[in-house]
């Protein structure tokens, strides 16, 4: 008798004769897609083809979507951390640190490994998987801590022969079973050398991950392909693909098996060729079967369009050859031009091989602050500066606010949005990546990177709010106090305003398109993850089918072993395809999606720069000129009056007013010239983003070809293995 009502036994995957008569409170009937052949026939279906049973609930067009959504939310909250043994929490942290991990959650590959190494039948594995992993929502991407707790509890119940229902889990809340899994044992053995000296100190959340790989997202997406075999085994491994990219070497590690034997995954056959001018290096083999490196942290390094140029000047703003573009916008040249120099709309850009600075941002697991006023901290690390500081999200907001006041006519990067009570793993990961893009765009900007506020933000080790109280901070407009050079205005091209309007129009349209592209690619990646989960369901269902094949064809069982071998081969290759799909979706999120978001942020920041120009670049020169004319007439009139008819000091007062107005006109005119020069320089900086577009398209196309080849190899291998299945001929 359950606290939430009786829960009749489920129709077994092959060994139970009870029939489910009603739904439990938690709507935890497993989807038959992952159950055995005998599961769907005993659910009280009135249809000949069982088209009103659990299969219907797995349809996205079904009216039971609300029921499935409620179950999905229930799995997350059924077993909070306070109700589970320490071994559950340790197991989750262990898998996050040593196993497959997607963002800040446990990936489906690790879920499959835990199930397959638990000694359960394929039917029980399929039932548990379908209970814990819903067909929609974030669980198709991986399991959070609450879902993982339910997974372990269900495995423990199955090993003890108990019912596999949420009611059964709730009944055992006070004394949850301790599951056994050889996969978790292997992870513990692997972690043993680096175990902490004080085992009694158990982290409730994953420890801060190490510094991230300092590569752009396109390079990180290629790293997930680096260990898929040698260059000779990959006909698509062009050395040109990796020219100019720095790949991080990782320590080799034995690959993690997936429970179905040696299955070819998306990260055991990629290759990496060095550039023509580089020495070819040995491909690292420390990637897991899902494409992740050891201890892959929940962090990423700066990347995207800013990280792919490799042409920043040596900290002198826009001076030197960078400014020799946009007509005659830059400093005077030597009078000689390269014959092959490209010029579009009068823009010419020279490049440099200087390596750009990269900043990593890690989300720290512990919250700080009083109850109801807690906040999360981020570890901001700069390898070039050798600094590591702790910052809050509000610190980033303060920095951007100061930069907007001081540099309103610069290409200021975008901050991810703030959301109240948003602690979901997906939102926190998106915000962290947005902070990575923001910080790296700052340090790669020729002017903003030299700003004292930015330097202090990245290097002051104390809490920023404390430093702000002690420091003298200036947020004056960058043009305040500057003297207009005599030749600057003449050096600007006459059609500069027309170029500004042309670029602004193109940027506005491009930004809208890239916003839509990011949304579409996120949707494609989610579909790939959902497709991977369904492939795993299909694989588990086929395995459970082999358990009843002998009984189904009991009249003559001679061909059953060969039949089961073919079915298991299909299950193995479906599992392999699931790994490939999951790896590809992850590569999209870390690679092409981040590249598109960098390009989107770049375009939106330029669009906002033009919007700020409309608001802040105004002047009142026409009004001042009219007032000067009026005061000059008044001054002439005063001077023509008799000496006693003029009040003392009135003439001096009018003269001072005229002088101040003329001085204001000169200052406002100079400021207008500075604004034009500033925006011109920003467009020269922005011009480099076109080359990032080329790289992201090249990288993504190569990635798609490689994964397509791997999928083709996988299904070709399956075709060979099922060739010998009995045909009754």
From Swiss-Prot:
Main location: cytoplasm
PROSITE patterns found in the cross-reference section: PX
Gene Ontology molecular-function annotations: phosphatidylinositol-3-phosphate binding
Residues forming coiled coils: none
Gene3D superfamilies named among the record's database cross-references: Arfaptin homology (AH) domain/BAR domain, EF-hand, Phox-like domain
Membrane topology: Peripheral membrane protein
Keywords associated with the record: Cytoplasm, Membrane, Protein transport, Transport
One Gene Ontology cellular component: membrane
Start and end residues of each stretch annotated as Disordered: 1-43, 177-340
Entries under CDD domains matching the protein: BAR_SNX8, PX_SNX8_Mvp1p_like
UniProt-recorded name of the protein: Sorting nexin mvp1
Organism, as annotated: Aspergillus fumigatus (strain ATCC MYA-4609 / CBS 101355 / FGSC A1100 / Af293)
